[in-house]
Amino acid sequence: MAWNPAQPAHHTIAPSPRKRRHNVFVIAPRAAEIPGLYVHLLADQHSFEKFSMPDVTLPVVRSFFLFLSRRKMLRRWMETSPLARRLATRFVAGETLEQALDVARRLKSEGITVTLDHLGESVTNLEEASAARDAYLRVLDAQHAAGLECNVSLKLTQFGLDISYDQCFANVEQLVAKAAQFGGFVRVDMESSEYVDRTLKLVRDLHARHGAVGVVIQSYLFRSRADVESLNAAHIRVRLCKGAYLEPATVAFPGKRDVDRNYVDLANLLLDRGVYPALATHDEQMIRQIESYATSHKIARDAFEFQMLYGIRRDLQTRLVADGYRLRLYVPFGRAWYPYYMRRLAERPANVFFILRNLFRS
């Protein structure tokens, strides 16, 4: 039965197949209803607000979007829908490297730097990992040739971490060496908690050899304060974010307030003792707290940078640049935009409302 916008959508409550043992549940529309549901929710913000009810906990909302990120049928529909592609172009620079460079040039003229992310997925063989390495080498070469800062972000599973640590290290080392040659930088994104130890080991080993590499730390993990202190002591640059993966309560704060409180505490620790920290958030209240702390502790505005996602909170981006803060945007590009898109909604469901607002303003 097709979904009727005049009536509430029917939903099924089912355990997430990947996290069943943690008793995490997802709310999912019937498969046949998804296209109509998306179109209607995008057209009617009031309906979406009703759909995202306040009594739905953050882990459930996160699991919902992560569930959608794995739905092949929805992905096929989204990637061929004119409306969905319109949304994607608002938050993804394009499918080609040249489109991403055009965005980077425009942002540079506005006083904003970027880190480019060539979107991809976990690889299943070493040939795919080598192809990902070669694609990123082309990105760094193109940034350098265009007179842009050479700065990229990447996920280790795209370079073979699940297959061979040594081969993953060799692949990423080529990128870090090239970035160092160009005076650039490679940021290693953090994935789910099972990857933290391997990711930190690889970053430490690369940093000891080349220096031009840093890592992401997620404030929703209990272990993150100890990791930040250790990275500060090793003079390794950290990007701080909240975290987007569905984690059990044994390793992560389940509540948003605790995640936010830990974020601010870690941001202050990075401002005090870190090496050019990158503070990634779209939360204006949190940004005000960071600004206040930096001012009261006489921390120069060029000693750290704010980071945001391309296409979100452009009003806040403009304000930060006008106030003399450094700002870098995370600019993704490539054909594999759908999983990225859904992970961003999982990370912060309020991004949905930024998307809706920007869609209807354009």
Outline where the language-model segments fall:
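Intrinsically disordered, low-complexity segments enriched in small/polar residues
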Residues: 8, 20, 36-38, 323, ...
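Generic detector of low-complexity/intrinsically disordered segments
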Residues: 27, 39, 43-44, 50, ...
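Periodic, rod-like helical contexts
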Residues: 15, 21-22, 30-34, 38
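Positively charged, amphipathic and often flexible ligand-engagement surfaces
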Residues: 51-362
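Low-complexity intrinsically disordered segments
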Residues: 9-10, 24, 31, 50
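Low-complexity, intrinsically disordered or signal/transmembrane-proximal segments
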Residues: 7-11, 22, 38-40, 45-46
